[in-house]
Amino acid sequence: MTNPRMSMYSLASEAPGGNRGTGQQSTQVSTTTLLNAIHNIYLSAQPYRLDAGTSTVVNTWLTASQTGPNGSIGGTVDASLGASAWEHARRRAEDGCIVLGSLHESTPSVLAPFLSSLPMSTPSSLYKALDAIQPFLRCSTPYNPSTPRQAALGVTLTINLAGNLTAASIALSQGGIDTTKGLMNIPSEAGYRAFDVFYYLLTSASTPAEREFLGLKPASQYALLARSGTYDPPSYLPTADDAAAAEDFRTALKEIGIKGASHRSFISTLAGLLKLGNTLDYNVDEDVLEDVCEDVSGLLGMEPEVLMKQCTTEDRSTFVGGLYEALVDWVITKANVAIAAQMARIKDGAESLDGRGVRTPTSNEEGEDTVCISVIEIPNPTLGKALALRGIFDDSMGINSEMIADGIEVPATGSSVLREMQNAVAEVAPDLGISSTPASRERQHELEKREEILEKIGLSADDDGFIKQLLFPVAGEGINLGTHSRLDLPALLASSRVWYHLSLHPTDDSPASLAALPSVTSAWSAGTVSRQLRAWRLPEWANRRNKNLDFTADFDVEEFVQRYSALGCKDGRDGIETWLLERGWSNGEVIVGKERVWMRESAWWEAESMLDLKPLNNLPGVGNMMAVNQLESGYSNNGSGYFPGQVILDDHSGSNGVVNHQRNFSHGNMSQATFNQNPVAAPSIAPTRMTGMTGMRNVAVGDYGLGHKGDTHKGAVYYNEDGEFIGPLDPELANGKQIETKSLPMKRRVWVFIVWAFTWWIPSPLLRYVGRMKRPDVRMAWREKLVLCFFIFLMNALIVFWIVAFGRLLCPNFDKAYSQKEVDTHQGQSDFWVSIHGKVYDISKFWKQQHSDQDIETTRENMLPLAGMNLDDYFVAPLPLTCPGLDIEDTFRLDLNNTLEFQIADHTSGYYQPNPATKLRAADWYSKRFEPRIKEYFHGDLVWSKGTVRKQGENDGRQWVIYDDKIYDLTNYFYTQKRLKNLGGSNFLNEKLINVIKQNPGADVTDQWNDILERAAGNATENQSAQNSMNCIRNTFYKGITDFRETPRCTVNNWLLLAFSIMLCAVILLKFVSALQFGSKRRPSPQDKFVICQVPAYTEGEESLRKALDSLTALQYDNKRKLICVICDGVIVGQGNDRPTPKIVLDILGVDPKIDPPALAFKSVGTGSEQLNYGKVYSGLYEFEGNVVPYLVVVKVGKESEQSKTKPGNRGKRDSQILLMSFLNRVHHRSPMNPLELEMFHQINNIIGVDPELYEYLFMVDADTSVREDSLNRLVAACANDGKIAGICGETALQNDEKTWWTMIQVYEYFISHHLAKAFESLFGSVTCLPGCFTMYRLRTADKGKPLIISDGVIQEYSVCDVDTLHKKNLLALGEDRYLTTLMTKHFPFMSYKFIPDAYCQTAAPESWSVLLSQRRRWINSTMHNLFELMQLKEMCGFCCFSMRFVVFIDLFGTIILPATCVYLGYLIYLVSSGTGQFPLISIIMLAAVYGLQALIFILKRQWQHIGWMIIYILAFPIYSFVLPIYSFWNQDNFSWGNTRIVIGEKGNKQIVAVDDEGYDPRSVPLQRWDDYAQANQLPGRRGGYPEKYEGEYQDQYEMDEMKSVYSSVRQGSVITGMQNRQNPYMPPQSPALFGTPSPGHMTRHSTMTGAGPFADPHLAHRQSMASMGAHDIQRTQSPYADYPTRSMGNLHGHASNPSLMGGNRSSTALGFAGGNRAAEASSSTFDFQRGLAGPDDGMIVEAIRTVLMEVDLDTVTKKQVRALVEQRLQSELVGERRTFMDRQIDHELANM
């Protein structure tokens, strides 16, 4: 090896040429990366290295109670972190501190498990001490069955430089214990308990003598314990038993020396505190107080007056808390004494634990150097967060300030992170020793007050009593509680090298719910874990540390030279730098500062490993680090018992020595698509169908490194055993016609049955040959259309029939009956009505004629006064003529009860006519001349209401009655009798009949008269008299008939119509009221939410496009927070355009015409092969009127086979919407993306400079719409004020309103549809149609961040490809915008969908009849089908009839009956104009009210111009309500059906056949996660680069004028096109991980200390020495940082990454090194490193097969499933010979079982 820079010791030497950068970690860690990694390590019970000094684990009480992968219990811990701290401490002779932080209040303690994982033996007394101490510190809460209440608990382990433990101690921090929440004032909610020790005291484990002495009662009798009412431990715990725990507790107390007298004093004090708690109520009774104090004083050894008289209630409360804390300090002191005693016995050899552990020989030198490793448990997430953030991000203190002072470039921390750190520190300032804050001063005041109270009570206690021992532990020092034997946490962290072990909790669910889960790791909430990651700023943490500050070792220059001189390092800075170059450490692995040398962990351990290879006599000593008894200790040359010495393969040493060395590679979350191939050669997908892709694994395998089974909503694929696609996305492949049969839903089956039931009589051959409908699905759609049109026609006919004819059927002569009041209204010259003897006559054509043969002229003056009158008294028939058989003389006549007002109109005929010359003189004039002539003008019957008849008969003396519904008025008859006194023949009528009238005036006498007539029938004379009298009454006294129009038969229809009219009017009125929104326009404050302005472009012209883009650019909204996203739906030349629409868009935006980015594959909404589409992405900045806004243009260009077609790439507006929605969905879920989406992400994230996940709103604007400047801000402000708003729209007006007649008739419709319909719906928060031309949707909920419009459910239903029925066609092909609103309402019924009139835009309306006809056909049909869908939704707001469901029904019904409405209006016009029927007053009033209220709306809004538009609209009403609906209904099936999928039968099942279509194979669109893709291509923006992405405000990361489009300006390395000549990226150096057999000096050593505590590995009771690990698998590294398969140097051609970032840094714990081969165990971990491109060898495959076969149920599993499980275990896709070998070996293993 001639080039020293290619040293075998440096991983950098294996990176191919090219720039190496600065050594910073290139991988950008994001929340998604961490979330995915942590989910995987949670499932596999593994830790995750965030950086070299930080590890994360996920634990619950359930996982902590299970046996881990290495056989230990207590939860997952990272043993390698402890090993790293141990190595640094002993090798560097520096103190270390391991912080066990908790990110969630529910995480279990890992203190004991972590201690047991350290690479040293620990005394059993340490674990017993923890068992004894923990009940004092922990209590049960609803969120954690064992919640620690201390600020921090530390275990300090003192080791010598050989790594042996020499001392151990336990201490609380000066923050003490939270006695308030743990004892004094526990929450009063169920589930909370006080400290466990009190319940142990009260259990039956106490002896009867103790209970009698202490006077213990049930827990409910103690105020301190009874607050929550919870006295038992959580029942979901498998070991929830206070009695058993109390027994273990008492045993632990004995082990640490608390027994006998000290135990009695101890429990007396506990009981005294418990009882004293009953005196802390301010309202306690005096007698109770005295009794309790008397009892307690005896237990505590003091006078009762001290507690009762000298102490207030507050003093006693302070005393209880302070004494308890002092008691805990005393227990800890006793524990430390016990630990020290055992350590002394071990050192003296006086104690051996009978081989239960390996004995660790200790040094006999008294003055040997020692260092301390402190393990600090900080259970409070707030305190832990403050300490951690300050240590990582605060550059003014700690190691960060030292590096800055030494000249190391430390990037400034983001302001949002600093703010969060400062807020966290301020919250716990007292615990950090910061005394300048109000909280600190308050804490100090409380401590001083506590000290005074404790001193007062303590001095009054017995001199030799236990209380004085507790309160005055050091004689002469007074009260020193909180300082004596406590840890100074800030000072400890400042003086030690800090390592972080962070515990996360997977869910916010209660611990009780975990017990019911199907598996230990079923509990998972990505939101919960993500919140913890973001709260602690772990992505920024990882990026900051790994890129710049991940130095774990630092030396003085002289110290560095002395340490590594044996490896060739020369004196001085120049010598060091030269040596670093020889090692290949020129990329930031080691940095030489002004005075110190800083090393990353990998470089440091590489150097230390090389030292281990050197002979003993060549090693320099550093102080006393190399003790004389090193070989005796069994450690390696460099003193390492954890890393065995390495075998040198030749005689050379130094940089040219050849060592069998391996490399560690991590794939983390990377897919196989990037791992197994050149990770830099990004795919450039041409618009053609490809079988493979550069940089991607061959798609024939079909899983893209993600497995055969993917996300069902994001590109799921399924394959059979031969690798052929069999999934549900599309059954058609390019292998001819295939038939697919699938069952139909019941609704569809019923509908098909109905269609055939109505259209069976139409033969299909007729449709096929005459109608030219060759396809069955087209014929079926025609039949469906016919049935729908029939139903629509039937409904319209029923409506017209109901309104017009139904009432007449029920009441035939309804319009032939008139009351006298109605007759009185007809008094015009051409409307001359009169009533005569119960009949109504219209003599309008008669009265002007000269009909008198006397001297009376027929003039207006004479005739018009008679109009509308009752003329009974003017036309009196002679009695002999009308009453034959009654012997009435010709000279007799009845006198009139009334005086004639107009004498000239008197038509007396017969004998009493005084003028002999007139024809009236004739006795038969009335019957022969008058009656025949007047019948010509008969118009109807005169009707009287029964109430009128009764009232006038009873009250007014009118002698009339009702007989057979006819009215007879005999008033003149009785008047004549009265005047003649019954003489002169005035009694000519039957007396019995007359008596009935006298007795019942105004009544119905039908029964009485019939009775008389029946009786008279037996007597001929009587019968003759009665019949003649009845005949006379009918002829002479007939007055009319009863008003039958008042009967139920005639009124029921009117009442029904009136009821519906009232409901409609109520809706109209409510709509009117909702539209009355007065007041000045509110001016919301400027908003700062990120918004994507989506503009789908199809065939619009340049003027429309420019208006739309300019209006969006000029919006009064932060330019950096809006993104214009134009999606061109195909390369299409619109009518009137001279170039394709995409070219117009790019020309407007100023994109360089030379730019031609690659076409990238994505899945479109289409059928068959049309699902495969290609698109191009452009980005840059657009400037208009000083506004510079970023834009993104996506052009759908189609496949190569489409280029000869007229519309390549065109898939419809819905596909354009889905393209962006799907992209944002995958951004939200961090899901694998297709190539087009990856490029979009890159352009937005890295070129434009905004993380796509920051966008919160999607603003949809059509390409022919211009938006007013303030509209977007108003929409966003409305959403910001109401977090329930999921969609919102504004008013859309016309910008070409005066262009043509066809635009004019639309102006008023647009206005009123918004201000009446949408304003009304907005009241309910349920706007049923958010127009696609001007609508904004919220992407995710404001509270929990759940996706809304980008949710899986909405996208899945909106992106349906099989649009094969008439209903689906109308929903998805015509009214996609309305259907999108329907889907949003369906999936999120409790969200609001609003309309605000203040937001305003203008759009271009159709200017020609043909375009208007086409538009309204789509609108009307889609409205009808969408409203039908809405009717089926269950969750619709409202109550009673006034619900949205009712309104939707009204709208649906109104749409369907539009033609009926027009016909009825025409009928009304005819009635009014012709006068052929009754005047429709109510209908006219309703119409006037409807349009009057509409007019009132724009009048009140001062929109005067709409008066004219309203008139034009009314004139065009027949077009809107008749022509357009009829045309639309009949053209429901007018679609372009295509020929890809043909429905050939729907008789219970549906069959689909592919015709001339190659089909869509999902493998043609590979999917890959952004983080993996970005890492593989060395791209920035791996989801963690912007601190504003998490909590806090957005920090602008760029200046707008500095942003360059990747295509419109300088060509950059696109993520998709890649760089043809790029080599593998630089790989940060890793540990060489040397291995070999042990040196002769390596011997098995035995220790008298053991980790056999409750958390130790039960399988490793006889644990081997760390020096005996040389027998490990030859393919395993033996670094403390990893234990994973490695490979030889010859295979190092793939991309490697820092394992701490990508999840590969997964070492087995120290407890897991039992020697032997652990290949199977390692391969089972998701985070074990792969063997690179070489793949797993035969042995690994065989081992994986055997493991899988042992785990599965052979009776149910298939070979395919076994193969998948084996590949999953191997984390590799086996192909070719490897696959064949696997299949053969599976068969072999099955045969041998």
From Swiss-Prot:
Q: Where is the Cytochrome b5 heme-binding domain?
A: 815-877
Membrane-spanning segments:
750-770, 786-806, 1056-1076, 1452-1472, 1479-1499, 1507-1527
| EC number annotated for this UniProt entry | 2.4.1.16
- Keyword Signal annotated: no
Q: What's an example Gene Ontology biological process for this entry?
A: fungal-type cell wall organization
What is catalyzed by this enzyme? [(1->4)-N-acetyl-beta-D-glucosaminyl](n) + UDP-N-acetyl-alpha-D-glucosamine = [(1->4)-N-acetyl-beta-D-glucosaminyl](n+1) + UDP + H(+)
Q: Kind of enzyme, top EC level?
A: transferase
Region annotation (Disordered) maps to: 1-28
Q: What's an example of a GO molecular-function annotation for this chain?
A: ATP binding
Q: Can you cite an annotated GO cellular component?
A: plasma membrane
Glycosylated residues, per the record, are N70, N164, N638, N664, N669, N897, N1019, N1023, N1421, N1534, N1705
The membrane topology of this protein is:
Multi-pass membrane protein
Where do the DEK-C domain residues begin and end? Answer: 1735-1791
Q: Which InterPro entries match?
A: Chitin_synth (IPR004835), Cyt_B5-like_heme/steroid-bd (IPR001199), Cyt_B5-like_heme/steroid_sf (IPR036400), DEK_C (IPR014876), Kinesin_motor_dom_sf (IPR036961), Myosin_head_motor_dom-like (IPR001609), Nucleotide-diphossugar_trans (IPR029044), P-loop_NTPase (IPR027417)
Q: Where in the cell is it found?
A: Cell membrane
UniProt-listed Pfam families: Chitin_synth_2, Cyt-b5, DEK_C
Which keywords does this chain's UniProt record carry?
Cell membrane, Glycoprotein, Glycosyltransferase, Membrane, Motor protein, Myosin, Transferase, Transmembrane, Transmembrane helix, Virulence
Q: Which PANTHER family match?
A: CHITIN SYNTHASE
**UniProt family annotation:** Belongs to the chitin synthase family. Class V subfamily.
Protein name, as recorded: Chitin synthase 5
Source organism of this protein record:
Verticillium dahliae (strain VdLs.17 / ATCC MYA-4575 / FGSC 10137)
